[in-house]
C-alpha cells in the first residue's frame, strides 16, 4: 500500500522524506547516498507510512519547490493518494493468482450428502462433520436442494434430522435459525469440498474477479450489520495475526489467497470517505476539482488528525477485544 504512494510520488517528482514500516521508536534506518528518503523500521509494526514533502501544512514550504506535494498538479496528487489502494488490488490479484496455482481451488461436492458442520443449530444439536443426511422429518432427501427446501420450511421449529454416522442411523433434533430477515430456516451445514487444480488462464481470470467480489460481499455484510440483521464481528491486528496463522497451517496456496483477500479489503477500507484515510483525502481533492479552489490546508489537516485519532481509538478497542474478550 505505502509502496504505491511512494512510487507514485516519485513518478511525479515529489520528494519523499521518509518511508517507514511501523511507527513509534525507530529500530533501524538507512538513508542512501544522494537520496532524500530515509527508509526505516519502527517498533510498532501494525501501521506504515510515507512522509512526502509539502503534505504537512504546518511545515515551512517554498511555493517554488517542485518536489512539494502542495505544489504538485491536482492530477499528480490524486494519483499519488489513489495509488495506495490501487496497489492493494494489484497485489491482491498477484497473491491470489499464485495461491491458486500452488493450492488450487475448493470445489463443492454436490454428489455427496455428507455435511460440513459450522457453528450453529446443527452443531448444537450434535450433528457432526462427515454425517450423511438421510431424511428430514421422515422424508428422504437425496440432493442438497431437497435438504435446503426441507430445512427452509421450518424456521424456529424443531425438526428430526436422520443421518448416517459410521454405518449407524442417528436422529438429531435440530431447530433451524433464521436466514437473515427471510422467513426461512438455516442450520449452518454446507457441502463437503475437495481441492481442484487450476490452470494459468483460470487462475488469471479468478485473480482479477475475486478481489472485487470479496469486497462486494463484505460491503453487503456491513449493510446487514447496520440494518440489525447480523451482529458485528470485527478482527483487530491480533485477530488477523491469529487467523493468518490458522490459514498458514492449511498450506501455502490457501495462505496466499487469504493474504490476497486481506490486501483487497485493506484497499477498500482505505477508500472509505473518512478523514485520515485515502478516501477522505480524495474527497477533499474531488472538492478542489469541482470548486477549482484548494481547501484551507490547515483546516483539512485538523480534520484528518481527528479522523486518525478516531481510527487509532477504534483499533485499540478492537485489539483489546481480541486479547481479553475472546
What is each PLM-predicted segment?
Residues 2-63, 262, 272-291:
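Small-residue-rich helix-interface/hinge motifs
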Residues 1, 41, 84, 147, ...:
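Residue-level signature of catalytic and energy-coupling elements of molecular machines
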Amino acid at each position: 500500500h505505502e509502496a504505491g504512494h511512494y512510487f507514485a510520488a516519485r513518478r511525479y517528482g515529489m520528494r519523499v522524506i521518509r518511508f517507514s514500516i511501523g511507527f513509534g521508536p525507530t529500530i533501524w534506518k538507512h538513508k542512501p547516498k544522494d537520496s532524500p528518503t530515509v527508509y526505516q523500521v519502527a517498533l510498532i509494526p501494525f501501521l506504515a507510512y510515507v512522509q512526502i514533502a509539502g503534505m504537512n501544512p504546518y511545515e515551512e514550504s517554498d511555493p517554488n519547490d517542485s518536489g512539494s506535494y502542495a505544489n504538485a498538479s491536482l492530477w499528480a496528487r490524486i494519483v499519488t493518494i489513489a495509488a495506495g489502494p490501487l496497489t492493494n488490488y494489484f497485489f491482491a490479484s498477484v497473491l491470489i493468482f499464485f495461491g491458486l496455482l500452488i493450492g488450487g481451488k475448493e470445489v463443492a461436492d454436490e454428489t455427496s450428502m455428507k455435511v460440513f458442520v459450522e457453528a450453529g443449530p446443527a452443531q448444537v444439536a450434535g450433528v457432526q462433520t462427515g454425517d450423511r443426511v438421510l431424511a428430514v422429518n421422515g422424508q428422504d432427501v437425496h440432493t442438497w436442494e431437497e435438504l435446503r427446501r426441507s430445512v427452509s420450511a421450518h424456521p424456529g421449529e424443531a425438526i428430526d434430522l436422520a443421518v448416517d454416522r459410521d454405518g449407524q442411523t442417528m436422529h438429531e433434533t435440530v431447530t433451524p435459525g433464521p436466514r437473515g430477515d427471510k422467513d426461512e430456516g438455516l442450520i449452518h451445514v454446507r457441502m463437503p469440498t475437495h481441492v481442484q487444480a487450476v490452470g494459468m488462464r483460470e487462475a488469471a481470470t479468478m485473480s482479477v474477479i475475486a478481489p472485487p467480489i470479496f469486497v462486494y460481499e463484505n460491503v453487503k455484510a456491513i449493510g446487514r450489520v447496520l440494518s440489525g440483521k447480523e451482529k458485528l464481528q470485527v478482527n483487530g491486528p491480533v485477530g488477523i495475526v491469529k487467523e493468518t496463522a490458522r490459514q498458514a497451517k492449511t498450506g501455502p496456496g490457501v495462505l496466499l489467497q487469504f493474504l490476497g483477500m486481506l490486501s483487497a479489503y485493506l484497499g477498500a477500507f482505505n477508500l472509505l470517505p473518512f478523514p485520515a484515510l485515502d478516501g477522505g483525502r480524495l474527497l477533499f481533492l474531488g472538492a478542489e476539482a469541482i470548486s477549482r479552489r484548494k481547501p484551507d490546508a490547515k483546516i483539512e489537516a485538523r480534520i484528518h488528525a481527528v479522523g486518525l485519532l478516531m481510527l487509532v481509538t477504534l483499533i485499540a478497542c478492537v485489539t483489546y477485544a481480541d486479547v481479553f474478550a475472546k
